[in-house]
Design a protein with these regions (language model features):
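Generic recognition of stable, solvent-exposed alpha-helical segments in well-folded globular domains
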Residues: 9, 51-54, 78-82, 111, ...
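Active-site beta-loop-alpha junctions of metal-dependent nucleic acid enzymes
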Residues: 24, 32, 41-64
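Short, surface-exposed basic-aromatic patches at helix termini and helix-loop junctions that form
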Residues: 32, 58-64, 82-96
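RNase H-like two-metal-ion nuclease catalytic core shared by retroviral integrases
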Residues: 72-74, 78-87, 94-120, 135, ...
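Short, solvent-exposed helix-loop connector elements
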Residues: 118-134, 153-157
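Charged, gly/pro-enriched flexible loop segments at helix/strand junctions
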Residues: 140-171
């Protein structure tokens, strides 16, 4: 895999369960390109394979480049026969993070708070109307985030005169 070219997408879900995991509630599927930072979201009814697949298919069409690699965590919503079959049918490679390694999906994990929680908060969403509204929200967030928000990536560190480390970023 050439991780320096667009198309290497990380995927993750965020639960909109409020203070309790009891019952059915919406989840937001986030997919982020590792090179460009292009991020797309859609909310689905739950983590069932049919909803996750519908979300992946919808989001894949929103990226301005084809998906080459689908990189997810080890959750059952992504690691199953349905998702694997869908990816194989489209000649898309599937990668997964290492179990219990929190930094394996740093690009998409950073979007959970920066994008999803910032706009949808920590509330519970469990009705059809709320699900529809969340998806309308993600379309607007996508426009602002992908077209009007510059992104910078850390490329290294330097040491200041007083001996502190300072992160260096690339140009936006």
């Amino acid at each position: 895999w050439d991780e320096s070219r667009p198309g290497f997408l990380e995927a993750d879900t965020v639960a909109h369960c409020g203070p309790t995991l009891v019952g059915e509630f919406a989840r937001t599927l986030t997919m982020t390109d590792m090179v460009t930072g292009w991020t797309e979201n859609c909310s689905v009814r739950n983590n069932a394979a049919k909803w996750i697949l519908a979300g992946v298919e919808a989001l894949t069409g929103r990226f301005p480049f084809p998906m080459v690699v689908f990189d997810s965590d080890c959750g059952g919503e992504f690691i199953n026969h349905d998702v694997a079959g869908w990816l194989q049918d489209r000649d898309i490679s599937q990668a997964r993070s290492r179990p219990y390694q929190k930094n394996d999906q740093a690009h998409v994990e950073s979007k959970n708070n920066h994008v999803v929680r910032k706009h949808a908060f920590y509330w519970r969403y469990d009705t059809d109307g709320e699900l529809k509204l969340l998806n309308e929200l993600w379309e607007l967030v996508s426009l602002r985030l992908n077209f009007f928000t510059p992104t910078k990536k850390p490329v290294g560190y330097t040491t200041t005169r007083d001996g502190r480390k300072k992160r260096i970023y690339d140009a936006p």
